[in-house]
Amino acid sequence: MKVIILRTFYIFNLNKNYIGLATSEPNKIYIILKSIYSYNDKNIVIPFNLFKEVCNSINVEFFNKYFYDKLVNDEDYTVFKNIHMYHNYFTNEESKMNIFKSHIKIKSNREDNIFLLNIKDITNLFVCDFINEYYNYFSSSYKK
């Protein structure tokens, strides 16, 4: 029996006031987001307010349409409401993406999954994998 190890990627839409910091020192944005992610006090007002300052909401309709238009002709892709799935047995990729108003969450057995590869074209998104200490900022200057 093969064990599939899934990675969880969180994608945030950065506020324009933090784009400069994300470009010059992305590790500081990662530290802020990780502190929000790891916050375990019962008072959630502090991390909620910090999150609202650093991140903008996700345009759910835009991202649903964006991924649908990109992947609709791929037989390995399915979508239901805000949940996008990709199961490719030839490349052994198993990926699931949930689009929320606060963030996008991708669970995948691959770091180079179909959703991250396609989302790189959208600017000002910050990607984190808190468990594996991974982060990346997709700016307007980013090209494959």
Each model region followed by its residue ranges:
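Acidic (Asp/Glu-rich) sequence patches and key acidic residues
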Residues: M1-K101, D112-L125, N132-K144
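Active-site periphery "cap/insert" segments of enzyme catalytic domains
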Residues: H103-N109
